[in-house]
Every structure is written in C-alpha cells, then in structure tokens.
Amino acid sequence: MAIEIKAADVMKLRKMTGAGMMDCKKALVESEGDFDRAKEIIKEKGKLVAAKRADRETSEGAVVAKIQDGKAIIVGLGCETDFVAKNADFQALAQAIAEAALVNFPADKEALMACTLADGRTVEAAVTELTGQTGEKHVVAGYEAIEAPFISAYMHVITGKLAAVVGFNKELDAQVAKGVAMQVASMNPVAVSAANVEQSVLDAEFKTAVEKTKAELIQKDINAALTKAGINPAHVDSEDHIESNQSKGWITAEQATQAREIIKTVGEAKAANLNMQMIENIAKGRVQKFLKENTLEEQGYQMGDGKTPVKDIIKAADAEAKVLVFKRVSLSD
C-alpha cells in the first residue's frame, strides 16, 4: 500500500536538503516516508547528475568576497548557465560557502570542501545536492584567502563572476584601497612587484621573448627579399595564403614557387647568422616591459589616468603604506 506523503513532509525535506519540491516528494515516495533514506536518495541523484555532466564547462556562477578581523576569502561557485547562476538557491549556497570559508579559514580548496555549513552539511555535500536539484554541473571553481593588517575587497557587481582582495601593511584611504582592489580585478597582475615574480615565470618570459625576437629578425630579412623580388609578403605569409592567393590570381604559380624558395633559403641563412647577444638584450627589454605591465606596483592605475604607477597612487595617499598580498578569482578567465 502506497504511503501518503504530506505537503508538510515535503517542505520539511526541502528545508533539510535544499532540493526541489518534486525531487523531495519523489524521494519520500521512494523511501516510503523515511527521511534519512530520502536524503540519501537526493544525495545520490546529485552524484549521478554530477558524474554525467563532469565534462561540462562552468563559466557562469557567483564569486563572493568577505572580510573579517584581518582575514579575507574569495569563493567562486561555478555552474553551466546564467539562468541557474541567478537562482536564489544557487546564490544562497555561494554566500553560505563563503561564510563557512571565513569562519574556518581553510588552507586550500580541498579543505574548504570538507568544511561544514551553518545547516550542518559539508560544502561538498551541499554542492552535490544542488547539482541534483538543478540538473547542472556545480563546482567550487576558485578559493583564495589572505591575512593582513588592512584589507580591501572588490566584487564586480554587474557579472558577479569576478572578485579581488588586497592586503596592505596598514590602514589606507578606503577609496584608494578599493581602487587598488579594482586594479587587481581588472588587470590581473602576476605579482605585487618584480621582486615577487617567480623565477620560473621570468625564465619562461625570457625564453618566449628570445624566440619571438629571432622570428621577427628572420621574417624581416625574408620580407625584404620578397619585396625586392616584387612579391607582396602579405600574400605569401603562410602556405594557406600562398595557395589561396594563387587561386585568386593575386600571385602566379611562378611567384608562389619563388616565394617558397626565398622563405626557405633566406630564412635558413638568417637563422644561421643571428646575433644572439643583441637578441638577448632585446629579450631582456621585453621582460622588463612584461614586468611593468604585469606587476601591480608598476601597472598604470586604471581608476586614474591609466599611466601613473599604482605604487605612486598608494604613496600619495600614505608614504608608508604598501601592498603585502592580493588574490583574485574569476569564472571567466
């Protein structure tokens, strides 16, 4: 005999799990009114949905930043669609996870997943249950935490998918501090200053700069030789372009053959006679440019004229103030 499921029981289970009304009713019917079993059914449904949608992109969602007593956290909760991201239950879970992160201050995302929410569920369980409720993949896509004497935060109010927190060595004018947090959010620096950039990053940038400089010098000689031969370099800058432009009648078959020969012979000759000292000097300059554009202190302040370095903006507000640390979470990167 089928057990009668009362509306009050459905509401009770919904309050316990956060699942949808129909999912709660189905779980109670299947469990014959056993609440513990019904909760397990809902949890298993969430795991099943999560497994089926494991390869889905989660570029939508909510990013929440919170500050309290010299500590700050950012949590990014991702989902598949903007529709679900705006759902009240989804937004509430993002806030609840952020609160748990601020209270427990876990060391990393793995530790955050084991934290307990105010309703008694772990973060992992709550995310899985919401996955079952919405039918979309949900994931804690980002988590960052900092400690500092003074902290400012910025959350992008339009998209809700980006936030940054910045820690200073001392209290700073609120408007300036928030502006620096906005700088971090919008410009995504790699470090506070050049001294804080990891050597592996510098090595990779130098290597890239060397290869780019080599390619440019080789291409410069090739272009000069092509132009001297009466061939437009733009018409033969790739094999696809050579074939396409030949079919359009922009270059002849003879010019195509000649261009290929010039590209090969001139390119090989130049590559064998590159001035590596000059190339490395150019590469070093490019690394310095990278540091200026990608370290917070040296970046042009975007909330001002876009040219004045952030460090000068901070110094003008307080000569003793400086940035100690920053973190950023974005669902769109």
Segments the model singles out, each with a brief description of its role:
Residues 2-333:
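N-terminal assembly/interaction segments in proteins that build large macromolecular machines
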